[in-house]
Each structure stands twice: as structure tokens, then as C-alpha cells.
Amino acid sequence: KYQNSPESDIYHKSNVLYYASKLGIFWTGLVHDLTKFTPTEFNRSVKYFHGKKSPTIVERASHDNFSYICVAHTGRNKHHWQYWVDYTRWEIVVNKIPYRHALEYVADVLSASKVYNPKDFNFMVAHDYFKEHSKTYLMHPATKEFILWCIKEAHDNGFKAVKKKISKAKYIEISNKYTPTIIVPITNIGMENFEIK
């Protein structure tokens, strides 16, 4: 009913706010994704609005798989893993998403799952979807583990099991198992390796 429509953004945002408040980050939920209303994101989203597909997918189809909407959005919103990925000439540097933004990601995943799969929605559907799709993300393993833990705990024991004091301690415990950044070497660097036609 709501998928990929203006109503879906409102429905998604209201669900993010609900889950964020349950996670103890009400203000973060309230200001979630406000950049969607900036000219860069909003105007292009209107231009590439389809009704059955995300505007980013439609824009990519028109621009050789590049989306200005996506680049602008993920570069301004700290709950997106792309925000925490940096590049040097020879390596990709993947940082952990800080605690508050990782919780916002949890709220975002739960809400998106509810919007896009309303008939079958439950927390484990969201958990499994994230687990499968995050395999292709350049996401720090500590962040991934924390997000999966939060969703499973909320599913098994309710939001009381992931209240701030508990989830913050778990975030620190998981984070301490990993280095702050993961370095991914880049091979075949340089445009000389590509044929430009």
C-alpha cells in the first residue's frame, strides 16, 4: 500500500520515530532523514519518482548506475554505513558507526522492513533481511554485530532488553573485540586499468 510513495516516507519516518523512542533516542528519531527535504534530495526524488521503485533506482537507470540522491543522502546522514567509509589512494577505511547512530540504523531497518513487507513483518524478518543484505556492505563488523544483536534481543525479550544502559554496554563489549577501523586494500588502482569508450 505505502511502498515507494510520498506516504511511504511519512509512514517510514513515523515508524523510525516510534522505534527510536523505544531505543531511547527520541530526538534522533525525530530528525531522522530530514535531508530528504533539501533541494538536492527532494527535487531529484520528485524528478525520478516512479511509484513502484525507489527514485534512486530510477535515477541510476538514467545515469550509468550513479545516484546523486543516494550520494547526497548517505553522505549527510550518520546512520548510513557509507558515511563511515573513507578512501585513500591504496585502501578503503571502514569505521564503526557510533552508538547513537547505530541505534538509529536499528530503528531504520525495523521501519523499512515494516514498510516494504507489512504482511510478513516481524523483527526476525528484519534481522534476516539485514543479515543477508549487509554481506555486500562495507560495514564495520562491530556495527553489523551490534545491529543484529539489538534486533534479535528486541525480538526475543522486547525493547526493555535493549534499553540504553544495556545496549550501550553491549555496544562497548562488541566494539572492544575489533579494531576501530578495518583497512581494505585496493588492488588494480588507477584508471589506466580501465578501457574508456
List PLM regions with ranges.
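Metal-dependent phosphohydrolase cores
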Residues: 1-196
